[in-house]
Amino acid sequence: MNLEDIRDNPGARKKRMRVGRGIGSGKGKTAGRGVKGQKARTGVAIKGFEGGQMPLHRRLPKRGFHNIFRLDYNEVSLGKIQAAVEAGKLDAGQPVTEAALVAAGVLRRAKDGVRVLGTGELSAKVTLEVAYATKSAVAAVEKAGGSVTVLAAPAVAEAE
């Protein structure tokens, strides 16, 4: 057997049908699109349209809602605070607030407050002024000789 003897299996490579090239081709005139109607026209069909059948997005029930008063908190671990203190980005003598964490590069941007999580080790004596702290975080800060002040949540304006 030589290289020139190798052939594709019969029907393995089928030529593509060129549509709309005259009635003699077998796919001329309407080019396999049938006659008139929306599907015969150019352009994309309506997304989600299922030919008059109730579309999937309307068959499924509505669920949930979007709470416009939901607060978005930054979460920071004690390990990250300790790393920032060790790197000299945070001053352990000053209160650790959201603004201080943003300035130190621990957080990207200020949101509705900071939630301190108890993961990681903390040995620095720090004073935290945050919106929320877990029980384990408060215990770890107080064990290191620091303190935690939980700030009041921002007031939500009453709808009139």
Curated annotation (Swiss-Prot):
Ribosomal protein recorded as keyword: yes
Bias (Gly residues): 21-35
Family: Belongs to the universal ribosomal protein uL15 family.
Key words of the record: Ribonucleoprotein, Ribosomal protein, RNA-binding, rRNA-binding
Protein name as catalogued: Large ribosomal subunit protein uL15
GO molecular function: rRNA binding; structural constituent of ribosome
Subunit structure: Part of the 50S ribosomal subunit.
Reported function: Binds to the 23S rRNA.
Claim: rRNA-binding is one of the keywords in the record: yes
Region (Disordered): 1-37
